[in-house]
Amino acid sequence: MLDTANYTPRLKAAFSETIKAAMKEEFGYKNDMQIPRLEKIVLNIGSGAESVRDTKKAKSAQEDLTAIAGQHAVVTKAKKSIAGFRLREEHPVGAKVTLRGDRMYDFLDRLTTIAMPRIRDFRGVKPSFDGRGNFAMGMKEHIVFPEINFDKIDVAWGMDIIIVTTANTDAEAKSLLAHFNMPFNA
């Protein structure tokens, strides 16, 4: 039985034990508070045209995202009506969830060690940073996560994963994520 009172995620322990020291040496930080750390991970599934025809699709996306994240996901709604897409204001269009703390570290661990190796023809992720140390990536199918039962899903959703760090530069953020075993391709 897992003792949740004393549980520390594997990557969180690695950060405090080895990654902090490696980052301090690599970038010459004088203070531990200068070392970049993970702030949050935002997961988003846009159900798109599927939910315009059937509003239950957004609910399905929410349930799948809740299973993947281990935390309740929120249904996202359209901000304004767009007649060309048959979209109405406040119509459900997807789901999102923000992970912080231990759940964030657990998700990143599952992403890099379980989900990414299950992607067909996977050659690493493109290092797409925003200039301020935040990393964004997309996945074509959410079925690579072990929490999703392939037989029970009706649609294979694509999903966005945004990793927000306290890093000031992209080089610092890339180094931090590389220490967390993020498989970059270049």
From Swiss-Prot:
GO terms for biological process: translation. Part of the 50S ribosomal subunit; part of the 5S rRNA/L5/L18/L25 subcomplex. Contacts the 5S rRNA and the P site tRNA. Forms a bridge to the 30S subunit in the 70S ribosome. PROSITE patterns: RIBOSOMAL_L5. It comes from the Bacteria. Keywords: Ribonucleoprotein, Ribosomal protein, RNA-binding, rRNA-binding, tRNA-binding. It comes from Jannaschia sp. (strain CCS1). GO terms for molecular function: rRNA binding; structural constituent of ribosome; tRNA binding. The keyword Ribosomal protein applies. This is one of the proteins that bind and probably mediate the attachment of the 5S RNA into the large ribosomal subunit, where it forms part of the central protuberance. In the 70S ribosome it contacts protein S13 of the 30S subunit (bridge B1b), connecting the 2 subunits; this bridge is implicated in subunit movement. Contacts the P site tRNA; the 5S rRNA and some of its associated proteins might help stabilize positioning of ribosome-bound tRNAs. This is Large ribosomal subunit protein uL5. HAMAP family: Ribosomal_uL5_B (MF_01333_B). It holds the Pfam family Ribosomal_L5. InterPro entries: Ribosomal_uL5 (IPR002132), Ribosomal_uL5_bac-type (IPR020930), Ribosomal_uL5_C (IPR031309), Ribosomal_uL5_CS (IPR020929), Ribosomal_uL5_dom_sf (IPR022803), Ribosomal_uL5_N (IPR031310). Belongs to the universal ribosomal protein uL5 family. The keyword Metal-binding does not apply. One of its GO terms (cellular component) is ribosome.
